[in-house]
């Protein structure tokens, strides 16, 4: 190519199209060209742009010679530039001698054809440093062959291309020599002294030695622009005859690029010059004239025979050979791309590869785009070539060539060191091959260069890039000269060029750290070379990228190009001139590169797998740039171990290598050993190359790790050794070996480019990094990249980090994590296996980049890493999955090196995960790298790993977890579950409370133990609210339930609207998501809620008004709204249907005259039916229907049905709904649904209609979807029986699981049955809940419960004609109340309990759903709620509450007023009450008697409990405490147990045992009279006031009234005997349950307490009862009362039985006047005490005198005498009742009798009291037995009561009714209830106060007290 072309080559803007697309000279050239394309930098790319300086000017004194090197440096840029003509470059016959099978016959590349030259160098470069092909084919290849048999082998495989390229380069050497004559080839591993690229190996060797020496000692950027430029200017041949020249060929190509950069940057030139000056490790080998070795020879020379400690010169040579072979393969492709000018094109490819890396660097070093880019390429090449040189030292020619390749691949420093002449020769050879191949188009080159420049980004200063690259290259070169060379081979070897150079743009970039921003990113994400190092030698070579598609494709695919996709124009200025910020796509091209590159490299790289540690094995393709690290990486592995880690030179910016070169930086060291699956270049991609580069750079200059944006920075860092912490590793301590001075290459996260392969195995940012700082690893999260890393980051973040990351220190292990390959090489999933990548260290950078790109793409294939998941976990998962994805997991995470970067997965993982075993040592963790490793692609977000700090913690965690526990010595240590170690304990309690206890692990140290042992002890027990842990989602509107009044309507509508909106927003509920009709059901659910909202909004009406119809129509047919709104506009205009009818004139049915005549004839005869069917047969439907309308209804139905079948259903369209409507009109209601789903379909059959042919045309079940249309038609056209059709439709829908739709139909039908689950006739249990197909758990859905409650509210509360509430819904309300309590919403739960109790009380007709279990459940919940709310905790010491305080005060006051305090009974009751009130009231113990009576009172008042609770229970000390005290009493009785058991239904027996007498009585009352009725409700209400105990007791009564009677203490049943005990109890409970109950409860139990507290009412009643039954009876009653006083502890049964008998006798016979007189006297005496006890007693005193006066009159009046008549007071009236107002007395006595009965039983005046109780008791007796029927039992008791005392039974009924209403009476006592309530109150007081009931006076007082209590209750 012309010299101008050369200048254009390195400057993409100046490069010409012919350079971009050189003509391939042959298959080798084609191969090289491909690689060149992969590495070729777009003409517009910065690498090319610098070409404004002619390569000859910059790199070579001779412009002719310079051109090729520049092209080599940046194939894309230089493609247009003609490299030195083949005649100038010594013919590489020697190289051709052993043409490699990998290397297709590479025609000699004239300098005009730079691409061929590139091909050879790239191949070599791919293998070692792309330098060998570039080196003088004659001298260096020859030397390389002897010096490095492996390199020779690889060359032999690549020999054809390489030799041809050498020869061509030699022929073109004059150009290269001229350009490189002054400049060392080290800069890019290209011929720095192009005039003597192949010819002056000695000079090259010396330069390389100097370079390596400088790298060893140098910590600053390797670039020394003045020196480098001078070296180029001096014309020092990059490749001498010495071994150096073989390495240099690759370097030569890059050397030109470097020289270009060198001209731009003296600093870079100086650096490369220094590199040249430093003798390459392999320099020792004789500097025989470079002759192109056979691929095998090159491979042998590369065979890890690198100078670097990692590999010997032979391995380097072998690896170089492999790289050369891969490069040849790739270069052949690249050459094909550059067929126009093979030499120029391959050189362009090489230059593109170098430029790709350098471009990333060049953006930062824009000052001299050409010089910097060339320097960057040279730096990458040097880094790679250094390794290659070391490998080729044995054979001066071959080794120097390898070294040059290594230098070119690494940082081009080695390339500079290699003679520029050799480089020129090699470039010519490569260019010749490239020309033979297709020269990449200038556009491609420009795009590549631009992408490279973009990769470099502004953050990547060109100087830094060059320096960083140089540093990395020298470092890796010194460390692994062979490795660098191996990586560089891509430049020199045809194999490496296409892949490496083209893919990365400058594949060397992948391995060349000089482009820190991009290359570091790539390195962070192991440069493709790293991932496929072994596999992708060619791709690794900067110029060897044969697998890579044509330059354009590669460019698109290459990471750098992708980064610069937006900057691809071949005319765009290079980044040096113009700094593109971050083309997002530019990174991907590099990634893509491996995709195209990998195939050949894989074949090449397949060989690489064996050399997991040895570089020769790495595939040449992988070797090129990435291979530099890869092939060299084999050495680098050892290199890290062997190579001293000089402090990495702090890079002013991350490794100069472009984002594509990041792999180059870290890659050479990374791939000290080829990844076990080198075949998968992507798998190995991330491993060795980056690591090699890093390690390489660490010892020497510590080139910043070229972080693969996708490779974890840590991995590259690990490979590079103490690489400066990458930005990602910022959070983790820098590896101790990190050299802060060296600026780690920008973390790949900024560059999405897949160069990760380039990067040495991405260090686990979370794992300690190897001592060698991952120079590439430093990726500052703030550093921008030219391309957005996000494109790859997500992939990488989810991709397991490559083992390379885990292999930190060993260059072999720190393989570059394969960057995600945008190019899409998912084939290498294994590459992502953390283990595998380390094996790939040999893959050339370009290859690594490509493979890393592939890996990046593949990584997603491997278990995607969640970048947000802690690395530790992600790493584990990636390890599990990634190995699967990555077939070769061979490279195990370097456990040996704690600094080893964990596999790539660590990249995506948090440090904690990567801090696995080896990572416990954090020293090598790069804070910056850590994010990269976490995120894999080094995304900006990933770069900063929030988990990075966790890395340390993770280590600690592991350590802490490993601590041993101190086992107990009490045999607990034998527990197989090891519970003695402690475990969290969580207990969920009532009311949403949660107890938690977490064990405490206390470390205990013992003598002689370095680590403590853990002692597990119980932790603190804490109480929480469940809502604190699981917040209940707050809706916009809270449910206003319970819904009791119309005032809740507005709130309910708001709540319904909010729920509907929530349903619409949330979409398909998860519950029905799996349902086949989930979408439909979701819509139907919303529709159901809307219908209920309309129902509530219109007060339970769904039809009748246009407004309602419109609302429903809008809901059911939302689309009709538009029609309605559009109607006004259509007024006067025909509707659409009308227009259709106009368009298609209607045609009357074909009227067959004969058919009409037949109908007429039939009608004439009178055979209408025959006429009808004749009309039907002839489809004369009008005739048929008219005639049928006059006939029987059945005929009409049949005709319509036939019409529907034949005319409607046969019509096309959705006619099911219309057919159903017609059927309904015809009266075929049940059959109407058959039109939707035919019976055959419901039966599971599919019938085929032969008539209409539509039988199988559609799914028969599709008709279900017409339910909405059908419903709308029916609602809009109501008929008499359409409700039945809606029922049938609902049942049909329900049978198919369309529950919501079915319930909508049921609601509109207004005939559906709402019932319980056990009701087979029930159509609906809960709206929206399918009770037929789903489990009962579905019936606990809160939404369904509340929706049904809203429906009930609308129909029963809001409706003008309310329906009865749904009885079965009470149980579900209780369930909801429990759920509220569990949520901590106890007040709302209490409200529901009260509402349920009120409903039960208000119920007049018992329902089977109102049963004892429901009562008990309400009582239990209410009791618990009262306990929790009043006590405020579970403490056994109840908190004082106003209720308690007021209750105790009122108890004392009542007792004082009643005078019970002095009474033993009252005192006892008071004591009992006090005990209940006191803090120890709940603790068992207080007298069971008092407690049982209290319970009995509670039960007695249970029916009246509402009043009791409202009044007496609240105010009575004991009952007041009943909420508290009554519960306490229960507890005292061990009622806690009973209470609990009662709550469960088991303890009732226990309670009753203690409370049996009273409980049975009340329970009889409730159960007998009100099991399902109000009594239970009353009981519940009463219980609420009494708290848990009251409810519990009633529950017990309700639950086991009989059982208690039976099970209750023998006294209960015994005393109650058969029915009588219950009768008294029932009677007493109704009239004054306390009197009766107390005795009944057991005369001994509560009588005292009961009498004292409640006797006042009882006393009141006593006079009345006495009067009512008879005086004798009354007298008997007092006696009984006394006996009861004595018998408080005795059973009431006997007393009641006697009292009953006496009462009956008194009522029947009415004793003699004496008896009456006695009764009157007794009555007179009673009133006085009563008056004393009561305020009325005062009046009673006067009355008493009157009574005494009247006593004589008694005989006059009859039994009672006139005395009663004298007294008109209530008491007197009672007496008077005997005279005139007997009936009135009886009526008035009616209420008292219970009281009297109560007192008589208590007082032992069983005769008088007995009669009334018996009367009531007798009724009650049936209840006990009939008690289960409860309600029925109740009425009977009431009715029987009248038997003896007509009035008392009513009172009993009242009490019973009050029992139901009793709960209500507490607040307001009706006259009848009032006695009952007073009685109940008295009984409650008695319960609390004790047995004072024995005394009549006390009883009277009790009466008053009861009144007071009642008043307070009110």
Swiss-Prot record:
Q: Which UniProt keywords apply?
A: Autophagy, Endoplasmic reticulum, ER-Golgi transport, Membrane, Protein transport, Repeat, Transport
The membrane topology term of the UniProt record is: Peripheral membrane protein
Which residue stretches does the UniProt record annotate as biased composition, category Polar residues? Answer: 142-160, 285-294, 512-521, 849-860, 1506-1528, 1555-1566, 1852-1866
Q: Does the keyword Transcription regulation apply?
A: no
Q: Which Pfam families does its entry note? A: Sec16, Sec16_N, TPR_Sec16
**Listed disulfide bonds for this chain?**
none
Q: Which GO terms describe its biological process?
A: autophagy; Golgi organization; intracellular transport; protein localization to endoplasmic reticulum exit site; protein transport; vesicle-mediated transport
- The annotated regions of Pro residues compositional bias extend over 596-621, 671-680, 743-763, 1810-1827
Q: What is its main location?
A: endoplasmic reticulum
| InterPro entries attached to this UniProt entry | Sec16_CCD, Sec16_N, Sec16_Sec23-bd
Identify the GO cellular component terms for this protein: endoplasmic reticulum exit site; endoplasmic reticulum membrane; ER to Golgi transport vesicle membrane
The segment annotated 4 X 27 AA approximate tandem repeats runs over 315-422
- Quote the subcellular location field of this record: Endoplasmic reticulum membrane
Disordered: where is this region?
Answer: 1-31, 58-294, 352-376, 469-873, 1506-1568, 1600-1763, 1776-1914
In the record, the note on similarity to other proteins reads: Belongs to the SEC16 family.
Protein name per its UniProtKB record: COPII coat assembly protein sec16
Q: Which organism is it from?
A: Aspergillus niger (strain ATCC MYA-4892 / CBS 513.88 / FGSC A1513)
């Amino acid at each position: 190519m012309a010299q101008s072309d050369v200048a254009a080559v390195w400057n993409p803007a100046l490069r010409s199209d012919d350079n971009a697309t050189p003509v391939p000279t042959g298959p080798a050239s084609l191969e090289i060209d491909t690689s060149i394309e992969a590495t070729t930098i777009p003409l517009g790319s910065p690498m090319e742009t610098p070409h404004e300086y002619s390569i000859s000017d910059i790199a070579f004194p001779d412009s002719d010679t310079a051109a090729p090197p520049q092209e080599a440096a940046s194939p894309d840029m230089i493609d247009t530039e003609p490299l030195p003509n083949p005649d100038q470059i010594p013919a590489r016959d020697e190289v051709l001698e052993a043409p490699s099978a990998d290397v297709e016959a590479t025609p000699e590349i004239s300098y005009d054809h730079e691409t061929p030259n590139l091909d050879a160098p790239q191949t070599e470069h791919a293998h070692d440093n792309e330098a060998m092909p570039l080196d003088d084919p004659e001298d260096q290849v020859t030397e390389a062959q002897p010096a490095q048999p492996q390199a020779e082998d690889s060359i032999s495989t690549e020999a054809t291309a390489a030799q041809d390229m050498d020869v061509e380069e030699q022929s073109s050497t004059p150009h290269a020599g001229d350009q490189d004559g002054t400049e060392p080839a080290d800069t890019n591993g290209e011929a720095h002294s192009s005039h003597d690229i192949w010819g002056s190996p000695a000079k090259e060797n010396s330069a390389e030695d100097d370079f390596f020496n400088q790298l060893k000692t140098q910590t600053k950027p390797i670039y020394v622009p003045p020196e480098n430029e001078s070296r180029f200017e001096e014309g020092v041949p990059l490749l001498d005859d010495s071994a150096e020249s073989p390495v240099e060929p690759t370097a030569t190509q890059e050397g030109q690029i470097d020289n270009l950069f060198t001209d731009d940057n003296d600093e870079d030139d100086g650096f490369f010059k220094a590199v040249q000056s430093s003798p390459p490790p392999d320099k020792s080998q004789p500097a025989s004239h470079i002759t192109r070795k056979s691929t095998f020879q090159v491979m042998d020379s590369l065979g890890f025979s690198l100078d670097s400690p990692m590999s010997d010169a032979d391995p380097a040579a072998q690896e170089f050979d492999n790289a050369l072979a891969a490069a040849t393969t790739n270069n052949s492709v690249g050459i094909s791309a550059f067929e126009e000018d093979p030499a120029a094109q391959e050189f362009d490819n090489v230059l593109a590869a170098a430029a790709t890396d350098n471009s990333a660097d060049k953006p930062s070093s824009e000052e001299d785009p050409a010089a910097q880019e060339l320097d960057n390429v040279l730096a990458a090449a040097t880094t790679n070539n250094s390794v290659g040189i070391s490998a080729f030292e044995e054979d001066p020619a071959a080794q120097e060539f390898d070294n040059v390749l290594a230098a070119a691949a690494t940082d081009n420093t080695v390339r500079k060191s290699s003679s520029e002449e050799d480089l020129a020769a090699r470039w010519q050879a490569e260019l010749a091959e490239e020309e033979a191949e297709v020269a990449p188009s200038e556009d491609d080159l420009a795009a590549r260069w631009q992408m490279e420049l973009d990769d470099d980004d502004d953050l990547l200063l060109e100087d830094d890039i060059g320096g960083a690259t140089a540093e990395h290259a020298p470092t890796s070169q010194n460390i692994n000269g062979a490795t660098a060379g191996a990586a560089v081979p891509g430049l020199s070897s045809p194999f490496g060029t296409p892949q490496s150079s083209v893919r990365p743009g400058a594949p060397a970039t992948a391995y060349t750290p000089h482009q820190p921003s991009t290359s570091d990113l790539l390195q962070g994400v192991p440069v493709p070379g790293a991932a496929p190092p072994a596999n992708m030698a060619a791709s690794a070579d900067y110029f060897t990228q044969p697998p890579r598609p044509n330059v354009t494709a590669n460019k698109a695919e290459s990471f750098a190009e992708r980064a610069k996709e937006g900057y691809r124009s071949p005319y765009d200025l290079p980044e040096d001139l113009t700094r593109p910020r971050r083309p997002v796509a530019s990174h991907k091209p590099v990634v893509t590169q491996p995709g195209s590159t990998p195939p050949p490299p894989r074949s090449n790289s397949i060989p690489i797998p064996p050399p997991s540690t040895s570089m020769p094995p790495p595939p040449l393709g992988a070797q090129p740039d990435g291979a530099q690290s890869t092939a060299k990486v084999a050495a680098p592995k050892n290199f890290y171990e062997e190579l001293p880690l000089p402090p990495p030179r702090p890079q002013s910016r991350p490794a100069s290598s472009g984002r594509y070169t990041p792999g180059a930086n870290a890659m050479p060291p990374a791939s000290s050993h080829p990844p076990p699956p080198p075949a998968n270049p992507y798998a190995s991609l991330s491993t060795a190359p980056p690591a090699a580069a890093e390690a390489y750079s660490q010892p020497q200059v510590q080139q910043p790790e070229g972080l693969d944006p996708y490779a974890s920075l840590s991995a590259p860092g690990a490979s590079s050794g103490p690489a400066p912490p990458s930005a990602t590793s910022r959070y983790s301590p820098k590896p101790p070996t990190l050299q802060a001075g060296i600026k780690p290459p920008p973390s790949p996260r900024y560059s999405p480019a897949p160069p990760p392969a380039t990067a040495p195995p991405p260090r686990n940012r979370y794992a300690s990094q190897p001592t060698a700082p991952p120079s590439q690893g430093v990726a500052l999260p703030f550093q921008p990249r030219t391309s957005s890393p996000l494109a790859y980051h997500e992939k990488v973040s989810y991709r397991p980090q490559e083992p390379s990351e885990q292999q930190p220190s060993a260059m072999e292990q720190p393989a570059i994590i394969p960057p995600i390959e945008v190019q899409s090489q998912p084939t290498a999933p294994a590459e992502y296996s953390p283990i595998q990548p380390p094996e790939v260290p040999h893959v050339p950078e370009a290859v690594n980049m490509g493979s890393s790109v592939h890996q990046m793409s593949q990584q997603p294939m491997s278990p995607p890493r969640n970048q947000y998941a802690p690395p530790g976990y992600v790493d584990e998962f990636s390890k599990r999955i990634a190995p699967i994805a990555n077939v070769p997991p061979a490279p195990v995470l370097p456990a040996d090196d704690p600094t080893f970067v964990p596999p790539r997965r660590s990249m995506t993982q948090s440090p904690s995960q990567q801090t696995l075993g080896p990572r416990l040592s954090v020293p090598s963790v790069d804070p910056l790298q850590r994010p990269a490793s976490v995120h894999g692609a080094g995304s900006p977000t990933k770069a900063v790993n929030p988990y990075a700090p966790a890395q340390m913690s993770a280590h600690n965690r592991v350590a802490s977890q490993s601590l041993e526990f101190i086992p107990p010595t009490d045999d607990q240590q034998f527990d197989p579950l090891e519970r003695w170690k402690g475990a969290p304990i969580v207990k969920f309690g009532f009311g949403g409370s949660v107890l938690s206890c977490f064990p405490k692990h206390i470390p205990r140290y013992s003598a002689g133990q370095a680590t403590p042992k853990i002692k597990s002890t119980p932790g603190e027990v804490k109480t929480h609210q469940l809502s604190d842990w699981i917040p209940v989602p707050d809706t916009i509107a809270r449910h206003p339930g319970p819904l009791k009044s119309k005032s809740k309507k507005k709130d309910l509508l708001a709540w319904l609207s909010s729920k509907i909106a929530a349903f619409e927003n949330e979409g398909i509920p998860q519950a029905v998501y799996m349902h086949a009709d989930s979408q439909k059901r979701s819509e139907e659910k919303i529709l159901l809620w809307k219908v209920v909202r309309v129902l509530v909004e219109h007060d339970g009406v769904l039809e009748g008004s246009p407004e309602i119809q419109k609302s429903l129509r809008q809901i059911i047919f939302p689309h009709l709204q538009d029609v309605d709104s559009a109607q006004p506009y259509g007024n006067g205009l025909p509707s659409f249907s009308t227009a259709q009818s106009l368009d298609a004139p209607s045609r009357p049915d074909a009227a067959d005259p004969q058919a009409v005549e037949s109908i007429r004839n039939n009608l004439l005869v009178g055979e209408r039916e025959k006429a009808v069917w004749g009309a039907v047969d002839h489809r004369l439907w009008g005739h048929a229907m008219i005639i049928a309308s006059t006939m029987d209804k059945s005929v009409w139905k049949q005709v319509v049905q036939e019409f529907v079948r034949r005319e409607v259903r046969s019509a096309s369209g959705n006619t099911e709904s219309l057919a159903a409507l017609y059927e309904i009109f015809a009266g075929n209601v049940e059959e109407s649904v058959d039109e939707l789903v035919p019976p055959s379909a419901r039966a599971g059959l599919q019938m085929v209609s032969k008539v209409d042919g539509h039988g199988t045309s559609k799914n028969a079940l599709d008709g279900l979807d017409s339910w909405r249309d059908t419903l709308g038609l029916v609602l809009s056209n109501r008929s008499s029986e359409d409700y039945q059709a809606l029922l049938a439709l609902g049942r049909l829908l329900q049978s198919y699981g369309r529950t919501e739709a079915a319930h909508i139909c049921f609601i509109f039908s207004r005939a559906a049955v709402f019932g319980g689950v056990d009701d087979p006739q029930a159509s609906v249990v809960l709206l929206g809940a399918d009770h037929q197909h789903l489990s009962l758990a579905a019936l606990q859905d809160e939404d369904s419960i509340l929706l049904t409650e809203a429906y009930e509210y609308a129909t029963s509360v809001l409706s003008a004609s309310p329906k009865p509430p749904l009885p079965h819904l009470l149980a579900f309300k209780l369930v909801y109340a429990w759920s509220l309590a569990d949520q901590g919403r106890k007040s709302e739960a209490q409200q529901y309990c009260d509402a349920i109790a009120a409903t039960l009380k208000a119920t007049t007709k018992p329902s089977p759903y109102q049963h004892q279990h429901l009562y008990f459940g309400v009582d239990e919940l209410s009791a618990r709620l009262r306990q929790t709310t009043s006590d405020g905790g579970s403490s056994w010491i109840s908190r004082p509450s106003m209720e308690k305080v007021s209750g105790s005060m009122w108890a004392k006051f009542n007792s004082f007023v009643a005078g019970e305090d002095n009474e033993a009974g009252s005192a006892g009751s008071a004591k009992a009450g006090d005990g209940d009130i006191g803090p120890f009231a709940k603790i068992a113990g207080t007298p069971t008697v008092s407690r049982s009576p209290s319970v009995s009172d509670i039960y007695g008042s249970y029916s009246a409990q509402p009043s009791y609770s409202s009044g007496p229970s609240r105010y009575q000390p004991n009952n007041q405490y009943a909420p508290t005290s009554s519960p306490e009493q229960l507890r005292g009785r061990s009622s806690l147990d009973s209470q609990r058991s009662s709550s469960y239904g088991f303890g009732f027996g226990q309670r009753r045992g203690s409370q049996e007498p009273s409980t049975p009585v009340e329970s009889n009352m409730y159960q007998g009279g009100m099991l399902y009725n109000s009594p239970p409700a009353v009981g519940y209400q009463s219980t609420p006031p009494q708290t848990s105990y009251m409810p519990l007791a009633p529950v017990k009564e309700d639950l086991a009234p009989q059982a208690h009677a039976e099970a209750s203490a023998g006294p209960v049943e015994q005393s109650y005997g058969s029915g009588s005990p219950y009768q008294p109890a029932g009677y007493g409970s109704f009239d004054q349950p306390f009197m009766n109950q107390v005795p009944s409860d057991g005369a001994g139990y509560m009588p005292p307490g009961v009498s004292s507290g409640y006797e006042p009412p009882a006393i009141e009643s006593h006079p009345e009862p006495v009067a009512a039954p008879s005086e004798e009876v009354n007298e008997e009653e007092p006696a009984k009362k006394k006996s009861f006083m004595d018998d408080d502890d005795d059973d009431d049964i006997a007393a009641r039985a006697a009292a009953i008998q006496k009462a009956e006798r008194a009522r029947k016979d009415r004793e003699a006047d004496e008896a009456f007189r006695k009764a009157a006297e007794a009555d007179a005496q009673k009133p006085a005490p009563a008056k004393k006890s009561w305020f009325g007693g005062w009046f009673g005193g006067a009355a008493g005198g009157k009574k005494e006066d009247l006593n004589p009159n008694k005989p006059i009046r009859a039994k009672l005498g006139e005395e009663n008549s004298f007294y008109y007071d209530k008491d007197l009236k009672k007496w008077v009742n005997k005279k005139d107002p007997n009936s009135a007395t009886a009526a008035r006595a009616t209420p008292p009798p219970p009281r009297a009965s109560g007192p008589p039983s208590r007082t032992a005046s069983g005769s008088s009291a007995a009669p009334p109780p018996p009367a009531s008791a007798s009724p009650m007796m049936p209840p006990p037995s009939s008690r289960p029927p409860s309600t029925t039992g109740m009425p009977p008791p009431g009715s029987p009561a009248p038997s003896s005392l007509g009035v008392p039974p009513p009172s009993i009924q009242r009490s019973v009714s009050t029992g139901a209403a009793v709960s209500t009476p507490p607040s307001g006592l009706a006259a009848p209830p009032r006695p009952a309530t007073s009685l109940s109150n008295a009984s409650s007081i008695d319960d609390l106060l004790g047995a004072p009931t024995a005394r009549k006076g006390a009883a009277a007082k009790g009466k008053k007290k009861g009144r007071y209590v009642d008043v307070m209750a009110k």
